[in-house]
Amino acid sequence: MMIKQLPENDKPKEKLIAKGAAHLADSELLAILINTGRKGHSSIEVAQDLIKMARSLKELKLLSLNDIMKVKGIGLNKAIILKAAFELGERMYIPDLDTKVKITSPQDAADYFLSRMMHLTHEQFEVLFLNSKNVVIRHEVIFVGTLNSSIVHPREVFKAAIKWSSNAIIVVHNHPSGDVTPSKEDILTTKRLQECGRVLGIELLDHIIIGDAKYLSMVEGGYFDD
């Protein structure tokens, strides 16, 4: 059924105006961005095809322009609009660096990353660089891929820490499986970073593992050396 054949209150744009965006299904929100359908199919059906191809809503962000255009009814212009919208949605969860954020607990560190990282479908290793008052100076992505102690080298982490004149750091990475149990590689990486931090005088305060709407602090879990 084409959009124009739907009852007025069931059309995505009209429904958003009347009830608010929270009342629309994922496919209806995407349909607004897609705007028009293809011959014999509404923009909602095109949106449903896109979600089906991505396998889940959170994996839409990973699709390339060419991937998006594989869906019949989506050309380059529509793909660009969708890609831009997905990126904006991702950036909304990145803390504003102009706002001073003080880390006083593992929960604070987890909150800084949780909303953004728990949806990633790949592992990502990031670092929070802190000043002497544990205020965030900056954060950087150090590595993307499966965490391995031979790949996540302390040299790269502390090179950046020195560059930003950090007094301390907190490292964070995610488990796409949702399980926050530390692996042997996680534990080994943590110990190596602790040792290097002691030598350089830049303390590793914690290693946070992000899972599916939850986190684990390796300090609280007893994985840190005294």
From Swiss-Prot:
Q: Name one GO molecular function term.
A: metal ion binding
Is Hydrolase a UniProt keyword of this protein?
A: yes
* InterPro entries linked: MPN (IPR037518), RadC_JAB (IPR025657), RuvA_2-like (IPR010994), UPF0758 (IPR001405), UPF0758_CS (IPR020891), UPF0758_N (IPR046778)
Coordinates of motif JAMM motif in the sequence?
173-186
Per UniProt, residues of the MPN domain are 102-224
One GO BP annotation of this record: proteolysis
Q: What is the disulfide pattern of this chain?
A: none
The UniProt record gives the binding positions of Zn(2+) as 173, 175, 186
Listed PANTHER family: DNA REPAIR PROTEIN RADC (PTHR30471), UPF0758 PROTEIN YEES-RELATED (PTHR30471:SF3)
Q: What's this protein's name? A: UPF0758 protein Sca_1264
From the broadest rank down, the organism's phylogenetic lineage runs: Bacteria, Bacillati, Bacillota, Bacilli, Bacillales
